[in-house]
Structures are given as C-alpha cells and as structure tokens.
Regions:
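Juxtamembrane helix-loop boundary signature in multi-pass membrane transporters
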Residues: 1-20, 127-182, 295-326
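Hydrophobic alpha-helical transmembrane segments of multi-pass integral membrane proteins
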Residues: 14-18, 43-65, 87, 151-152, ...
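Small-residue-rich segments of transmembrane alpha-helices in multi-pass membrane proteins
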Residues: 19, 23, 47, 89-96, ...
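Membrane-interface helix termini and inter-helical loops of multi-pass transporters
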Residues: 30-41, 74-75, 104-105, 158-170, ...
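Helix-helix packing/entry segments at the starts of transmembrane helices
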Residues: 112-121, 202-211, 248-281
Length: 326
C-alpha cells in the first residue's frame, strides 16, 4: 500500500480545531435528521432527503469546478492502475449507514447517548485503522495509551447506560451507532487517501454523496413498498439542512485526516460531538432526558479518546561523548 508524502497544509492546532468543528457539525446533523425522521415518521425518507440534498449541492459545485473535475480523472486513473484500492470508492456506504442510524436511533435515545456510543466506535476504529496504516498518515503502532483509551471508551458507553433499561430491546439501538463509528473511521481514512490522490477534498466528498445517495435510494424504495410514503413533508427549513452540514464536515475530515491521522482527527471530532450533544439535549431535550450518568459517560468518552491519542514518551537516546584528541 503506497503512502504519499506531503507538506503540511496547516499547523496541527488548526487541524485539531477543524476536527472539533467537524464534530460539532456531525452532532448537529444527527439531531436535525433524528427530528426530521420523527416529524414524518419515516427514517428512510428523511435519510435519503438529507444525503440527496448534499449530493445535489456537490453536483452543482463540481460541475463548475475544474479542480474537482481534474481530481475525479486522477482518482479514476489511480483506481485503474491499482494506485488505490477500489473499495475506498465505497466509503459513501458508511456515510449512508451513519445518516440512517441518526434517523433511526436519535429519537429513541437522545443525541447525547447516541453520540457516546458512536464515538466509542470511532475511537476503536481509529485505533486499528492507524495500526494497519489505512489512512494517509501511515501506520501507527499499538501502545498502552491507545489500547487503554479504546477499552475506556467502551466503559463510557456502559456507564452512560446506568439508569436505563438493560433489556435487549433497549440496548440494541445503540449497537447501530457503535458499528457506524467504526465504519465512519474507515470512511474518514478512505476519504483522506482519495483526497491525497485527487488533490482536492471536493472529489472524495462528491463520490461519498453519490454512492451514499444511491444506497439510500434503494433502501428507501424497498421500505416504501411496505410502509408507504408520508402524506406531506414539513415546511420548516431547518429540517433540510442535514445534507449541507454533511458536505462541510466530510470535506473537513478529508483534509484534516491526512494532517494528523485517523485517531487524532477522531479525538478532535469527539470533543466537538460530545460538547454539542450535551448542549443540544440540555437546551432542546428530546425523548430521553440527559441524566448525570450520561454526562459522566460523555466526559469519560472524551478522556478515553484523549488518552488514546496522547503521545508516547520516547526514551532519551544516550549519545556517547567523542573521544578526546590525543
């Protein structure tokens, strides 16, 4: 697997700040899509409207953007020549699963508990993807900090469930954001690799939305055969912002992941996600109240990610004194 070397595009603190912003946007999208699904009582249709609107935005942009079109040609050449695995082009399926999980789960659990489960998966995914060198930043070996952080992230999910029903039917919805966290970590790594080849995040973002929209259209078509379609759609404009928000945060992560790696990018994203999740559930409570244990679990999830990303101290190498001149 070939890794491309590149000059840093930005300072590390700028990349981390952008990752935090991406996390804030992720949670905002989750809350909007979850509310949209509840409003129309159709998680599949709300998901395809969210993803499809993002695809239409990008289709217009790339139609007038020569760099994006050139990036598309470069990416196709790389796929045909074996310069990048074709599986990376399916990263949009992870995005589709993520959006669908928002519309299915957030209304049941609240955005804070959903986010704790999601970021636990994101941390574990980032850990192993960096170990395997899937992202553009190359391989990062296992360490005590990284393994401990991943285990602590799972503990954060368990802690957040204290006071909630432990029935299988109540816990099952949280498996979806947990798995989607792992998938999105892979999506971020794949997008980073494709962005390096294309020379612009526009190409990988467009491909994500094209593939994801296709997947959701097929799923929605099958679902509508049995459940039908809503009689009407809501008129509030904010329900339709999910796609535009997704365009922004996927573009950000495609750039940032090549600068600081999958796990560190995930750390910044997790900080933003947890912060926004608690704020949204506090000021705009949903079906589930954000209790003390969820707040503690959210804090623990952030500590877990920080621990996993904390750099390992390198032992000081002993430098022998040169022999004195005779």
């Amino acid at each position: 697997m070939t890794h491309h070397t590149h000059k840093p595009l930005m300072a590390a603190w700028v990349a981390i700040a952008l990752a935090v912003l991406a996390g804030i946007l992720r949670t905002s999208q989750a809350r909007i899509n979850g509310a949209f699904a509840q409003e129309i009582h159709d998680a599949f249709l709300s998901g395809v409207i969210s993803f499809g609107s993002g695809f239409l935005i990008l289709l217009v942009i790339i139609s007038f953007n020569k760099k994006g079109q050139q990036g598309w040609r470069q990416l196709m050449v790389a796929i045909r020549s074996g310069g990048i695995t074709p599986w990376f082009t399916l990263a949009g399926t992870a995005g589709a699963a993520y959006v669908l999980s928002q519309t299915l789960v957030v209304g049941l659990t609240g955005v804070a508990l959903y986010t704790v489960a999601f970021v636990a998966g994101l941390s574990m995914g980032g850990l192993f993807l960096d170990l395997w060198g899937v992202g553009p930043a190359g391989k990062k070996p296992l360490s005590f900090n990284r393994v401990g952080g991943a285990v602590l992230g799972i503990g954060a999910v368990a802690l957040s469930l204290v006071g909630h029903s432990t029935a299988v039917s109540a816990l099952l919805p949280l498996l979806l954001p947990l798995v989607c966290g792992v998938l999105v970590a892979w999506q971020d790594a794949a997008n980073g690799r494709m962005t390096v080849i294309a020379g612009t995040p526009l190409t990988s973002t467009f491909l994500n939305f094209m593939v994801g929209t296709g997947v959701l259209l097929i799923a929605t078509a099958f679902h509508s055969f049995s459940a039908g379609l809503p009689a009407a759609l809501p008129t509030q404009p904010y329900f339709y912002l999910g796609g535009a928000i997704g365009v922004v945060f996927i573009g950000i992560t495609a750039v940032v992941v090549r600068e600081i790696g999958v796990l560190l990018m995930g750390l910044g994203s997790i900080a933003g996600q947890l912060l926004m999740a608690v704020i949204l559930d506090f000021f705009f409570p949903s079906a589930q109240v954000t209790g003390v244990m969820i707040l503690i679990g959210a804090s623990l999830a952030f500590v877990a990610a920080a621990w996993a990303a904390w750099p390992k101290k390198k032992p000081h190498a002993h430098v022998a004194e040169p022999p004195a001149d005779a």
